């Protein structure tokens, strides 16, 4: 959404852009950075109403400052990338004219999307797991809990704070 065209005016006529076309294509998946900064509450609600949990992928678009304290970080290649500033949980270019990727973590996306849209938690979790796996064509391997799939699991509490992570059936030590 950040770099996409929306409704615009050409002479006296209004024409739809890529965003509106995406809403009209039922089979199209949309990727959403639901960090509470990139998109306002009302747009997240509209996206959820139009596309539903089976066509929304929650994506972090995170850079190396994700999960780190506010400060200076590099976007892209650590030697030749862009300098960025992370302030109040938002990555920005140094002149503060634009976002510079995201510093959101997946749990933040789930928490924020649920809080802003009131979508059921099971649907929001699907948007961060099974729906992206389907888009990538790997839902037979991951994205849900089933015999024969990778045991990539997280456990979180009622505040959607992660307390346990398992990758390929092996617990990660924090």
Which role fits each region the language model picked out?
Residues 159-166:
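Short, Lys/Arg- and Gly-enriched loop/turn segments at beta-strand edges
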């Amino acid at each position: 959404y950040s770099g996409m065209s929306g409704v615009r005016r050409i002479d006296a006529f209004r024409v739809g852009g890529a965003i509106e076309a995406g809403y009209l294509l039922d089979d199209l998946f949309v990727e959403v950075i639901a960090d509470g900064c990139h998109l306002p509450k009302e747009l997240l609600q509209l996206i959820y109403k139009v596309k539903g949990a089976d066509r929304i992928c929650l994506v972090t678009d995170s850079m190396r400052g994700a999960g780190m304290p506010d400060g200076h970080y590099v976007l892209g290649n650590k030697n030749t990338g862009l300098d960025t500033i992370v302030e109040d949980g938002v990555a920005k270019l140094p002149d503060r004219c634009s976002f510079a990727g995201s510093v959101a973590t997946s749990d933040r996306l789930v928490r924020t999307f649920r809080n802003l849209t009131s979508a059921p938690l099971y649907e929001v979790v699907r948007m961060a797991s099974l729906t992206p796996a389907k888009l990538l064509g790997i839902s037979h391997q991951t994205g849900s809990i089933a015999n024969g799939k990778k045991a990539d699991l997280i456990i979180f509490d009622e505040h959607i704070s992660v307390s346990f992570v398992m990758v390929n059936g092996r617990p990660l030590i924090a």
